Amino acid sequence: MKSASLILFVALVALTYARSYEDVKEEIKNEVEKEILDDLEEENDELDDNTQEVNDPRARRWRRIVRRIRVRPLLPYIPCIIQAYQTGKK
């Protein structure tokens, strides 16, 4: 969604300030290529980070486990966890 909004905004700016249709096409093409290259670079950085984490002999196992936990999949279980925690208390 972010990329689509950015492309539409760039297209609007290009249409506003362009001298001809060819300028608009070239501007949009350049921005799309730039966005694609940025996304690929970010993905490559993420893959490099994961590789370093797995191959790092100094990394502790628990630290890696905690890093890999994502909050969003755990959200539905939070009320159950709280209820189970409060059940033992009186």
Swiss-Prot record:
Main subcellular location: secreted
Domain of life: Eukaryota
Annotated signal sequence range: 1-20
A single Gene Ontology CC term: extracellular region
Modified residues (Threonine amide): T87
Name the record gives this protein: Arminin 45266
Protein's UniProt keywords contain Signal: yes
Function of the molecule: Antimicrobial peptide with a broad-spectrum antimicrobial activity. Keeps its antibacterial activity under a wide range of salt concentrations that mimic physiological conditions of human blood, which is surprising, since Hydra is an obligate freshwater animal with nearly no salt tolerance. Does not affect red blood cells.
Propeptide segment residues: 21-59
Keyword annotations of the record: Amidation, Antibiotic, Antimicrobial, Immunity, Innate immunity, Membrane, Secreted, Signal, Target cell membrane, Target membrane
UniProt subcellular location: Secreted; Target cell membrane
Family, per entry: Belongs to the arminin family.
Tissues where the protein occurs: Expressed in entodermal epithelium along the body column.
